[in-house]
From Swiss-Prot:
Assembly information from the UniProt record: Heterohexamer of two alpha and four beta subunits.
Amino acid composition bias (Low complexity), ranges on this chain: 132-154
Any one of the GO CC terms: prefoldin complex
Domain of life: Archaea
Pfam families to which the protein is assigned, alphabetical: Prefoldin
Encoding gene per record: pfdA
Entry function: Molecular chaperone capable of stabilizing a range of proteins. Seems to fulfill an ATP-independent, HSP70-like function in archaeal de novo protein folding.
Protein known as: Prefoldin subunit alpha
């Protein structure tokens, strides 16, 4: 069902290029989603840092229990903060140490986002090259079809 004949497998090649472009579009979308997820984590870290720096002992806060349920709690001691270290481990840190740990996490996220942006740029460049290749193939097919039509008309 390759119309016109004489395409020399160009249709299959076009289909392969189109599939590669589609895969790359999906890869770019996945990278964008991961970048967005990491930026949300950065926002969470910023909010945690702000809370650590602004809350005082005796402040009342809402503590999430899960399932969109909260309780009000009064902070007894803001001098010690429990910070997740990753891998399911947590550690108690003084206020400054907690902020420092969170800032380090944020820097790590920045690095990861930069790596993902570079990867995305590489994929997009490769995708542009493939799109140009597809356009050239399409133009060649059109020229071949026009030549065949001219020959058939003679």
């Amino acid at each position: 069902m390759m119309g016109g004949g004489g395409g020399g497998g160009g249709g299959g090649q076009m289909q392969q290029v189109a599939q590669e472009i589609e895969q790359m579009e999906q890869e770019v979308e996945a990278i964008d989603e991961e970048i967005e997820r990491l930026r949300e984590k950065q926002t969470d870290i910023d909010e945690a840092i702000e809370a650590i720096e602004t809350l005082d002992s005796g402040s009342t806060v809402q503590v999430p229990l899960g399932g969109d349920a909260y309780i009000r709690a009064t902070i007894e001691d803001i001098d010690e903060v429990v910070v997740s270290l990753g891998g399911g481990y947590s550690a108690e840190r003084e206020q400054d140490g907690a902020v420092s740990t969170l800032e380090t996490k944020k820097e790590t996220l920045d690095d990861h986002i930069s790596d993902l942006q570079e990867e995305k740029a590489e994929v997009e460049t490769e995708m542009e090259e493939l799109e140009q290749q597809a356009q050239q193939m399409q133009q060649q097919q059109m020229q071949q079809m026009m030549q065949q039509q001219e020959q058939e008309d003679e």
